[in-house]
Amino acid sequence: MTVDTDKQTLGFQTEVKQLLQLMIHSLYSNKEIFLRELVSNAADAADKLRFEALVKPDLLEGSGELRIRVDFDKDARTVTIDDNGIGMSREDAVSHLGTIAKSGTADFLKHLSGDQKKDANLIGQFGVGFYSAFIVADQVDVYSRRAGLPASDGVHWSSRGEGEFEVASVDKPERGTRIVLQLKEGEESFADGWTLRNILKKYSDHIGLPIEMRKEHYGEDADKPAEPEWEVVNRASALWTRPKSEIKDEEYQEFYKHVAHDAGNPLAWSHNKVEGKLDYTSLLFVPGRAPFDLYHRDSAKGLKLYVQRVFIMDQAEQFLPLYLRFIKGVVDSADLSLNVSREILQSGPVVDSMKSALTKRALDMLEKLAKDKPDDYATFWRNFGQALKEGPAEDYANREKVAGLLRFSSTHDTTGAQSVALADYVGRMTEGQDKLYYLTGESYAQIKDSPHLEVFRKKGIEVLLLTDRIDEWLMSYLTEFDSKSFVDVARGDLDLGKLDSEEDKKAQEEVAKSKEGLASRIKAALGDDVAEVRVSHRLTDSPAILAIGQGDLGLQMRQLLEASGQAVPETKPVFEFNPAHPLIEKLDAEQDMDRFGDLSRVLFDQAALAAGDSLKDPAGYVRRLNKLLLELSA
């Protein structure tokens, strides 16, 4: 390799400077991750070369045997990671190693918790793994040449992690990247064959290409041969191609960490080989935690796609529906061509058939997790429940299956935890109940004592309490489960069916008839703010409620539309009053029209507050309430 020429000194992007300081001064409890990250990057470089060489075989430069080499020099206190993958041009080195184009660094810094172990685990997830080299090194030198460029177009990138880096042109006959770490004082233990082999075994055994280290000679063989002998220190076979019976849980877990860029263990996995009409292997994982960008429109999602063990692309989104975007893993097909493109993957019988089967496989995996490990499923639900709730709208064919995986709070459990499955609810239904009742609201605390629940508590009927912002939208698609319809208890057309006896219904009709005059007076007082005023048959303790009018949007859906800047259609609630409540009896007896109007307005505003709505005229409400309080205290 010739001497550096055309040398430049450049400054790191501001966020990278912050990141380097963090790496150097904070993440020192789990130092060995540097090797995991650099080897993972080298494996990705090999995958990229394989893919590009499908179209341009010349990129292989006569050598298609890809490998990673890890070496060390005790005396010089260096560790070297060398690959013969795709390599980098000078421009690549500046852009990839000096700046971070995406918002990965800023997001990484924002998500730091102060817990070293947790923070170290975030490194790969946020695509900043290269900088972990500075945990153990006070100087990092990168020598690289992109495949297809002449030897004279090599690049030497160098930095001490202090805010600047140097980049220079250099001759590099071999394509690929060599990273030389000058270890800090006190980190000499990493310049050791046994230590490096153990770290590689722990983190990188699953990598699908050989990781080589120099053969070490001891005792009588201590004299090193003239040429170093290299030996493979990992299994170097694609994990998913091996029989399930031969793979340990720890191997699946390490493979997940590599494929998902996550240092935590998965909650579950499913490894399957399909033969017959289609021939493919899949290995799917359920992560243990949600990525920071799960709900970002342009977040990374999809499976790693291989065709006949040749890497084709990351993030092949076509094999799973969007609501399962959190599933990680690989699919290796023998039915797709090696020159498959994202456009070709958009449709077609092979892709559609694989998507259908993989979706079912993923849902089966979640069902098994829920059944066998409910605590782990609760963890899954906390992380990914809202994404799964998109399922009934997106995946009609699996609507019932997805519904069975959903979890809600309910009046059966006073903790407010989202732990109730629909099958649990159905199993607890009372005699004569043929509907599944639910109530939506902003929070469990806000709706657990809602007046809408009073009649259900009286009759001992469980009501699901839906408090995620997506829930009302979800229920517009999830209309039934187990052949039983869902009913929103906040709607004005609530019918309890067989749960009300004929005697109850007759008595209700008589009371409604006797209070028609009061209903008319209240309607006149409230005017156009209500669609209708009527006697309520659902209240036992509260004086009044506001029910949702027929065909109107509920409060949650209106708030969702407002937040997204969409026009919200005008709605008018139904005002229902409890004729047996003392306040309503006083209202009925009130002859002063102004006072009657004030009382009616106060009851209307209180009902709106109880429903979680905001008041159109809060100052008017306070004024009327103060006036009534003064009269009471006079």
Curated annotation (Swiss-Prot):
The keyword ATP-binding applies. Residues 560-634 are annotated as: C. It comes from Xanthomonas campestris pv. campestris (strain 8004). GO terms for cellular component: cytoplasm. InterPro entries: HATPase_C_sf, Heat_shock_protein_90_CS, HSP90_C, Hsp90_fam, Hsp90_N, Ribosomal_Su5_D2-typ_SF. Keywords: ATP-binding, Chaperone, Cytoplasm, Nucleotide-binding, Stress response. The keyword ATP-binding applies. This is Chaperone protein HtpG. It holds the Pfam family HSP90. Residues 343-559 are annotated as: B. SUPFAM superfamilies: ATPase domain of HSP90 chaperone/DNA topoisomerase II/histidine kinase, HSP90 C-terminal domain, Ribosomal protein S5 domain 2-like. GO terms for molecular function: ATP binding; ATP hydrolysis activity; ATP-dependent protein folding chaperone; unfolded protein binding. SMART domains: HATPase_c. Belongs to the heat shock protein 90 family. Homodimer. It is found in: Cytoplasm. Its main location: cytoplasm. Residues 1-342 are annotated as: A. The lineage of its organism: Bacteria, Pseudomonadati, Pseudomonadota, Gammaproteobacteria, Lysobacterales. Molecular chaperone. Has ATPase activity.
